[in-house]
Amino acid sequence: MATPQSDTSLSPAASPLRTVAVVGLGTMGTGIAEVLARAGRDVIGIDVSETAAARCVAALEASTARAVERGRLTEEERARTLARVTTSTDLAAAAGADLVVEVVPESYELKQQIFRELDGIVRPETILATGTNALSVTRLAADSARPERVLGLHFFNPAPAMRLVEIASSVLTAPQAVAAVTDLVLDLGKEPVSIGDRPGFIADGLLFGYLNQAAAMYESRYASREDIDAAMRLGCGLPMGPLALLDLIGIDTARTVLEAMYAASHDRLHAPAPILKQLSEAGLTGRKAGRGFYTYEAPGSGTVVPDDLTPREDGPRTPGRPVRSVGVAGSGTMASGIAEVFAKAGYEVVLAARSEEKARAAKARIGKSLSRSVDKGRLTAEAAAQALDRITPTGTCDDFADVDLAVEAVAEDLEVKRQLFATLDKVCKPGAVLATTTSSLPVVACARATSRPRDVIGMHFFNPAPAMKLVEVVRTVLTADDVHATVREVCGKIRKHAVDCGDRAGFIVNALLFPYLNNAVKMVQEHYASLDDIDTAMKLGGGYPMGPFELLDVVGLDVSLAIEKVLHEEFRDPGLAPAPLLEHLVAAGCLGRKTGRGFREYAKR
């Protein structure tokens, strides 16, 4: 087997990588060519198709023209950028390149053929980079005559806009090659993350498991495509929902990546959901085909058009029950936030805590929150005062006797919630809707603690409730249609986006979010990547507002572990077992920001 060799010709000073050949001029190859040319590199674009080469030139002309219109390039800079790019249909055009980047379709045979041909064309010191995100860099390197000069260079789409670049080394790659390419990536204005070789690397390794679970969730008819996507956008702050993202990536591409990941991990979470195979083989591969999970205006269009699965607004509806007053049980952050939301929407609110003192303290916190909204110009002083006046604090749920909707927001403990629901059953009037805000416990267990299970439903708000737009509406097998309709109508009146889901662990958001977080912990546990690199990769490559470890420390490691245990117990999938590292940190009392230490340490206030 070949081993990495020391080669001074690979030092950054000796090899500044001024000329780069890009093999494969599809969307990604064209984007990479633009990035390189705008950074002053001479680019040789190579594709066997003259049509693809012509499309590349046209796309570069259009893209740089838009950059001029937006003030990001001058006309002179545009002309220089375009002049740096030449195209060819002959791989021999790469002979003078310092670096060759291949971004051809994900096929070992095709990539190996290109690398073998390049071995006989390029100079001995030339570095060969594969743009794969699914195939083994090591296998490609081992088949090359220069394994020490082969590495992975994974840009994200669209390459001109996305800052992250993953640089993947095999066990054969020379450190000097990695250093030279890292310097180039920095010079391009990108954020390099250096990693080892495994399918998916960091970003796609975490992202595609999540996308696969979303596809499986949709396939099981647990929730609609619109609700799954809305839940992840509004509940996690993601720029796109998972099913829309699969359509953008290409369902066939996602299937290929997942097949490679499953072959390496044998983790059921990576086994492609059957619907991905069905859609791929039917040619319904997403936006590029004009249809995937959604239907588009035309192939290549991003405009979604209605189809047979689009929810109809004009269909028959079950009328909801009238709701004028709301009881909120609890005095913590979530209960206070929910009470504020209802009061601002014009509802009379009874806020019940374990003592009247706690209830008054919760109302005082709501007053401060309303004052902050006034200071930020989001609310008038008069509206804030009126909202606060609508809240009546009390130390007993007996004062819920006349409310139309009772919302439980106490500790995430099933026995505590069941006891409270037994109390609500006794004190609330007939016909009152009883809702739990649980994020992971079975709603039906709360319902069975009452003599009126048809009146019980889940209303999972997200924290902070006044700011977060999402509410997961959770029907049990016993929930009455008019109770479901009531909660949907109430969500509209309090300006929340309601998504429907069934009563199973994690509902939509947590069932998709926490396995992703758990897999990030496993990555660190296996010493594949650092906390910082993983957080950077998911923010810059996945569009997440926070990296997984930033989020875990905010949520609380104990809370996260509890949710992951519930998911594992319900679905009994070995891949959902909580990472031992997470369990060890919780056992040590390192719970995140609230204790000053979690995955990171925080300054004490």
Please tell me what each predicted stretch does:
Residues A67-I127, E357-K358, R372-V433, L441:
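Rossmann-like NAD(P)-binding element
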Residues V23, I46, T81, S88, ...:
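Structural motif
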